[in-house]
UniProtKB/Swiss-Prot annotation:
The UniProt record lists the keyword Membrane: yes
Lineage start: Eukaryota, Metazoa, Chordata, Craniata, Vertebrata
One of the protein's GO biological processes: defense response to bacterium
Removed propeptide positions: 11-34
Signal peptide: 1-10
Annotated protein name in UniProt: Temporin-SHd
Primary site of residence: secreted
GO CC annotation: extracellular region; membrane; other organism cell membrane
UniProt similarity note: Belongs to the frog skin active peptide (FSAP) family. Temporin subfamily.
Modified sites of kind Phenylalanine amide: 51
Pfam families: FSAP_sig_propep (PF03032)
Superkingdom field: Eukaryota
Organism: Pelophylax saharicus
Keywords for this protein: Amidation, Amphibian defense peptide, Antibiotic, Antimicrobial, Cleavage on pair of basic residues, Cytolysis, Fungicide, Hemolysis, Immunity, Innate immunity, Membrane, Secreted, Signal, Target cell membrane, Target membrane
Localization terms from the record: Secreted; Target cell membrane
Length: 53
């Protein structure tokens, strides 16, 4: 049993201009930028619990 893995994502305040997207691809890139660090941190935490002593 690995226990509970708690990930918290930081929510940053953004200007209205930054939220406005002209191209659909731009929003996909922004989602990737937000998701990947959290996913890597979660994977690192799991591996640390599996292989850590």
């Amino acid at each position: 049993f690995l226990g509970t893995i708690n990930l918290s994502l930081c929510e940053q305040e953004r200007d209205a201009d930054e939220e406005k997207r002209d191209e659909p691809d731009e929003s996909d890139v922004e989602v990737e930028k937000r998701f990947l660090p959290a996913a890597l941190a979660g994977i690192g935490g799991i591996l640390g619990k599996l292989f850590g002593k």
